[in-house]
Amino acid sequence: MPSEHRRSRVRVQESMSHEPEKDVLSEAPAIARHADPYISDDPAFGPEGKILFDLKVDAADTSDNSSRDEPQYDFDSEEFANIPEIIREVVGFEDDPTLPVITFRSLLLSAIFCTIGSTVSQLSYFRTTYAPFPVFFVILASAPLGRLLARVLPAYIVPLGRFSFSLNPGPFSIKEHAIIGIAANAGSQGQWATYLPTNAALYYGITMNPAVALFFGWGASLLGFSFAAMGKSELHAKREAKRMKVFWLILFATFVWQFLPEYLFPFVASLAPLCWFASRNHTVNFLGAGRGGIGLLNITLDWSNITSTVITYPYSVQVTVFVGFVITTWILIPVAKFGNLWGSPTYNIMSNGVFQKNGSSYPFTSLIYTDLNGIQHVNETRYEEVGLAYSGAQYTWEIFMWYASYISSFVWCALFLGPKIAKIWKARKAQGHYHKDRLRYAPILACLTMKEIDLLSVLIQKYPGMTLWEWVALTLVPIVMLLVIVALKKVWMPTWTYFVALGFGGAAMLPMSLVYAVSGYSIKVGFFNELIYGYMIEAKGSSRHPLGQLAYRIISGNVWYDARVVLEDQKIGHYLHLPPRDVMGMQILANIIALPVNYGVMRAVISSKYEYVSGQKVDPSGQWTGQDFKSYNTAGIQYALVGPKKLFASSFFKPVLYGFAAGGIAPLVIWLLHKKFPKVRFDLWNTTIFFASAATFYGNLSTGPFTAILIGTFFNFYLYRYRHKFWNKWAYISGAALDTGFNANLLFIFLFLGTTGAVMVNWWGNNAESIERCFAW
């Protein structure tokens, strides 16, 4: 019988342990990553993790003996020889091409979940902390909704000629379920491109033409076609009833609880015990406060400050991230502040803004003038009066860390993954052909993450694949779309720099994708892109508007941000026997649906929270800070308006360039230690992740990391190692429920309280002076 119709469960078993169970639905991204050539045996696991697991598929039908009909495969035979064991034991090797994929039901549910996901994700951009929209929730919710539609919709054929379709083609299929997950993930990522119209409105009083903003967003997002398939088998088994009940209970409890830290009782969002014992002592308050301080021993009961990364990140990654936090926030910040180092206290160490030499706010708008050709230049006379754009110590060494992270990704991959990459590439080159699947035009990346899967390639051949010309067309559409917008001077960047943005974005794709593949940790490339852009626009006649730098950063970054997901999820679609054209079509549809929603939410937040997110007032909760937008504006001022040539001529900024050297030396040291002491597992200490985590800005809110490492140690160290079956059964479903409950609460508060101007009265747990009761500020 077709494998899609089998009710199955996945038994996830670590190479050295026993039988934890997990649904393939929630395993799909991990399955794709675990097939990669470089696998670590770090004892933590998550959909974004890097642990090697043996996934074994057992029959799980609790109501019949359907498992007797399961085909038995001889995995020792030649036809399976080139298929990795982890893939052999998870995916099905039979396919029913008659199962419906794109139907009225899947389109309707995809549109609903895309709208919800894009709304929540866009709201999160304006907050200091947030929990990602969990696609796992979509998978859980779409199955019963799909079955409901299959029962209630009429079997009516909508007469549209060759495009006629049925409202109800029969039972809800696993392929419909999977395609909904693809669309929801593509549409719920949020749109980084909305940062451009947001910053234009917040800092320059410019309202971008909505059409330009939308087409710029579509072009940027379609550069890589981001999507993820989260499906292998449906949640049909009766044994799932208990887990689903627990999921909804946790979701509801989280939804109710979040009213306390987010609205009614914000005191619990940042418990600062040091402040309780010396609430009027400035030094103690700085050390203990999670808002504006370094959050030493600070505990949070707000899930947005924790998120499900305590479950989805491997434990080694969590430790690396926490070490980066400790070094920068608990050590370097106090040293700089109390030692009056790196510009402290003249430049606020807890700010990511820009300052004049005397510490006053930098008047960046007064430095910009536009010539008759519509090109923005620097008013050099005014610049001589204002001087260099300085930044606080924390933001300055953030640049250092990002430079180190960027270089480290290349060196790390060369040292730790280089031999494996070369071996696989030579083997595939010797074969004389590449996969006959949808990745055949990306052979380098395909060979890094997928071995020859002959039988699966045969199964997918029944579906028309994307031809070379179709790939070219799908690539040219967003490229031309963006080129027109850039050439018409709608995004303030010189046209020729657009092509450089594509080139540098492509160069970063390989090492950054590999780091993500083995860790689940996404590395930013923005600061390096800004440096390159800053030097390029030193050319005479180039626009120097800070928003041009942001447009360049968005375009260049999206090249690899989207490509990494395409690489991963093309494999998943391959494993699930999904028609390539259907997958592409749903991706495009998800982007078309999501972007107008993103734009509308962006305008709504600016309208209702403008004073907070623009920095004119301080949000009492410390959440609606818009700190990311401020960081991008600071970077635009320093790299585009002032320029790196002037910036790094200053002794204040010159040490930042040593970040490149640190990024090259650190992975080499770790590699040598790993070669000398392989049993110590120095290879788990990924320097790229360390530098990236150390570059995180904690000026507005430092509560969270301490609580997160405590919970992460409990989940991904103690439970994973010593209560593995319990962990595997409940960890992911709990994380998804907690994230979903938080996001539902966030959406409710914004729609029904935030937009209406409803303000919580002040009381002991919502003190007007300090919700943490740190009164020395």
Region locations from a protein language model:
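Alpha-helical multipass membrane-protein architecture
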Residues: 2-777
